[in-house]
Amino acid sequence: MRVALFGGSFDQPHHGHLAIATAAANALRLDSVLFAPAGRQPLKLDGTVTSFEDRLAMVELACLEDSRFAASEIDAPRADGLPNYTVDTLSELERRMPQAKRFNLVGADSFLSLPKWREPARLLELAEWIVVSRP
């Protein structure tokens, strides 16, 4: 199975997100694209105003557009209130889907900030990266 994690605030999900996911799924023969609203992003601690539950519900509706798309709670807010780190999310995806070929789908602007992320070298080991221009 070939699965891509597509994380983001998704406040609100829009056609651009769906177009990016569709293009990646088609180009890379992905079986699944998991849309994962971020719990608490360490590099964007002030930006999200819509609750995680509402953003997840919006993503669930958006994912109805393509059978390869699914909403995922894998990056839900942590019980301890600490920020969510992509390295932890990708590690959890590896734990849940050890046999899958894993990808991480991000915008080019996010990828450029990768050196600021927690454990950037480990991130590159946990998944292949799909880097896209934003529409």
What are these regions (language model features)?
Residues M1-P135:
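Nucleotidyltransferase catalytic core that binds NTPs
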